[in-house]
Amino acid sequence: MVVIRLARGGAKKRPFYQVVVADQRRARDGRYIENIGFFNPLAKDSEEAVRLNMEAYNAWVAKGAQPSDRVASLAKAYNKSAAQTEATA
């Protein structure tokens, strides 16, 4: 099964995650099909914490890919913030 999940990068005690589409049998940080964004849990106020290619995300979900719980919540929050910035602009 194809899943959308976080692959950890960064340094010790300084995590940085790539949002990737991968086969569930692959290792967490192993080979993936497509990189569709990133998540920085330690981002400061002025830094971008999440970037997600929503077109690719929605296309993979339509094809049957299962997002992890954390990725699903990040996508929901990213969609909400993108809608707010679009409404104010």
Curated annotation (Swiss-Prot):
Keywords assigned: Ribonucleoprotein, Ribosomal protein
A Pfam cross-reference name: Ribosomal_S16
Xref: InterPro entries: Ribosomal_bS16, Ribosomal_bS16_CS, Ribosomal_bS16_dom_sf
One annotated GO molecular function: structural constituent of ribosome
Gene Ontology CC terms: cytoplasm; small ribosomal subunit
Chain segments annotated as transmembrane: none
GO biological process: translation
HAMAP family: Ribosomal_bS16
Family per similarity comment: Belongs to the bacterial ribosomal protein bS16 family.
Protein name: Small ribosomal subunit protein bS16
Native organism: Psychrobacter arcticus (strain DSM 17307 / VKM B-2377 / 273-4)
Gene: rpsP
